[in-house]
């Protein structure tokens, strides 16, 4: 009887741990917004190249987005942020990773299907 109770307790603990990991897995839009806020002026057409702080944020975000869930969450957040910023030039936005020396596993575009990002 005690053995069955101990087994159930272990199973409950494992399920709880998996749920905690799953909820923390994806990058938040707050993280994406914070990392990329230094890029807004450039994305609106100001400057010939992204500022150093912008590239630092892009690199930090690329390093944090390792799992498929992270990449898909970042993709969705990028699209949401792009629609909320007035005067944004998507041509400049799509070129930011390359200008910062960062490889991104999906095109930065409003037409990107974030569910297909891996």
UniProtKB/Swiss-Prot annotation:
Disulfide bonding pattern of the chain: 29-77, 39-54, 55-100, 75-114
Record's keyword annotation contains Repeat: no
GO BP terms: lipid transport
Keyword ATP-binding: no
The entry's keywords: Disulfide bond, Lipid-binding, Signal, Transport
Molecular function via GO: lipid binding
SUPFAM superfamilies the record matches: Bifunctional inhibitor/lipid-transfer protein/seed storage 2S albumin
Pfam families assigned: Tryp_alpha_amyl
Signal peptide (from-to): 1-25
Cited InterPro entries: Bifun_inhib/LTP/seed_sf, Bifunc_inhib/LTP/seed_store, Plant_nsLTP
UniProt record similarity statement: Belongs to the plant LTP family.
Function noted in UniProt: Plant non-specific lipid-transfer proteins transfer phospholipids as well as galactolipids across membranes. May play a role in wax or cutin deposition in the cell walls of expanding epidermal cells and certain secretory tissues.
Protein name as it appears in the record: Non-specific lipid-transfer protein 3
